Amino acid sequence: MHRQSFFLVPLICLSSALWAAPATVNVEVLQDKLDHPWALAFLPDNHGMLITLRGGELRHWQAGKGLSAPLSGVPDVWAHGQGGLLDVVLAPDFAQSRRIWLSYSEVGDDGKAGTAVGYGRLSDDLSKVTDFRTVFRQMPKLSTGNHFGGRLVFDGKGYLFIALGENNQRPTAQDLDKLQGKLVRLTDQGEIPDDNPFIKESGARAEIWSYGIRNPQGMAMNPWSNALWLNEHGPRGGDEINIPQKGKNYGWPLATWGINYSGFKIPEAKGEIVAGTEQPVFYWKDSPAVSGMAFYNSDKFPQWQQKLFIGALKDKDVIVMSVNGDKVTEDGRILTDRGQRIRDVRTGPDGYLYVLTDESSGELLKVSPRN
């Protein structure tokens, strides 16, 4: 299914009076002076959260204690352009293993970089990561600073999904012998599952789950359907939400609802709808530069139930969407008055929304609806 922006305008205009007004939400700044924070992961038992800073630091934050010093044991990262330390997630068996997973950009011998993923053990005192092991590397390394992707999601069935950008090398998203522009599926131990779609295809990378992706920035499990949802940046226009299926081609750069930043057509593009490629479940004709995303699955605030929240880097707000099966509609925006690039959005275990702003003096925000 696709929706063009002129279908959305009446909905946005009607609903933005409700959702975009500053008075619709309460905002508490929990932490400031974060240097380009990228992701957060909640720790169990009210022990706060881990926060990645793109420059390469992993920090711990806890209410009443504030922000820790940088944790030791984190891998070296290539912090250039859009690269650096990216996502952080807890292993499904964290309570027993203390294992955390990190994604980050890693440079190769020729000075070009790619996304890498690994895991280590978080110490009981939350001060260090030990025994870090890299289990996945995007190959070949092609990036000079753009389109790393890097979001990590465990699906609750024993698998880890890794969203990878095409390193600003458009045609590679269609090449099954390369890991650019792909969604990768591994086991929760970092191994390649036997039922991955291209495992028996000669010349194809066995890690690949789906392909034809430009620059994925948000990924989350839909708690109502148990399906994985993914968003990605288009070029000039064409930001998308997809529900990636096994072995499917999501089009980039052959099919896109966007154009080049120059205003001209994408050279490889054959149109918006192209045979053999999947259509997004939602797209924006004018790109908000989507980022971290979170489904609201809590009883804390009934007015937020069945909502999907997506950060917007360019539009500097949080997009509020209603979810009905595999269909979504945009209800409007929140945090528009703050004028901050939104990098990550997560639903906390307490039912509040937690937001990271992407700035040299970024903030951790706690957000709730105003009754």
Swiss-Prot record:
Residues reported in the UniProt entry to bind Ca(2+): 240, 250
Binding site for pyrroloquinoline quinone: 82, 261
Keyword annotations from UniProtKB, A to Z: Calcium, Cell outer membrane, Membrane, Metal-binding, Oxidoreductase, PQQ, Signal
Subcellular location: Cell outer membrane
InterPro entries: 6-blade_b-propeller_TolB-like (IPR011042), Glc/Sorbosone_DH (IPR012938), Quinoprot_gluc/sorb_DH_b-prop (IPR011041)
Cofactor stoichiometry and binding remark: Binds 2 calcium ions per monomer.
Family affiliation: Belongs to the PQQ oxidoreductase GdhB family.
Biological role: Aldose sugar dehydrogenase with broad substrate specificity. The physiological substrate is unknown. Can oxidize glucose to gluconolactone. Can also utilize D-arabinose, L-arabinose and 2-deoxy-glucose. Has higher activity towards oligomeric sugars, such as maltose, maltotriose or cellobiose. It may function to input sugar-derived electrons into the respiratory network.
Name of the protein this chain belongs to: Aldose sugar dehydrogenase YliI
Gene behind this protein: yliI
